């Protein structure tokens, strides 16, 4: 497991004991990022069918998935986390298969009433973009 994934798992804002819900998992996701989040929280990731409150959410998003569907997914995910719980969209890096257009996540976030931060590298092939509700600062 690489050092970038380890460092960035902490930057996600997750803590030991946090329940992190994972949306839209597929076999192309970064397993090192998933493992580091699980190591950091000392919990398994739960899927979108988990029916209790969670402390944070990661959403794996790829080009070809509908932007309106992303906005709906963001709103659904935001509904299961606490007011300040971390919410991340993970996308393939530019130039990688499935990389969305640069404004796709920002547009969907705005539609969902959220601000999108600058992407950060979470693994060799994936970037992460943290979303926050409008008016919640940095």
Task: Specify the residue positions occupied by each region the protein language model found.
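S-adenosyl-L-methionine-dependent methyltransferase catalytic core, i.e., the SAM/SAH-binding region
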Residues: 1-138
């Amino acid at each position: 497991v690489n050092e970038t994934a380890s460092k960035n798992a902490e930057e996600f804002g997750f803590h030991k004991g946090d329940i992190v819900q994972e949306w839209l998992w597929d076999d192309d996701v970064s397993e090192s990022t998933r493992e580091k989040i699980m190591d950091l929280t000392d919990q398994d990731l739960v899927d979108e069918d988990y029916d209790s409150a969670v402390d944070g959410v990661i959403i794996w998003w790829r080009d070809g998935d509908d932007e309106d569907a992303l906005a709906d997914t963001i709103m659904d995910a935001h509904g299961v986390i606490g007011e300040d719980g971390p919410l991340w969209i993970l996308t393939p890096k530019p130039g990688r298969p499935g990389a969305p257009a640069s404004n796709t996540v920002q547009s969907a976030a705005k539609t969902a009433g959220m601000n999108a931060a600058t992407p950060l590298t979470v693994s060799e092939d994936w970037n992460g973009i943290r979303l926050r509700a409008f008016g919640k600062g940095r």
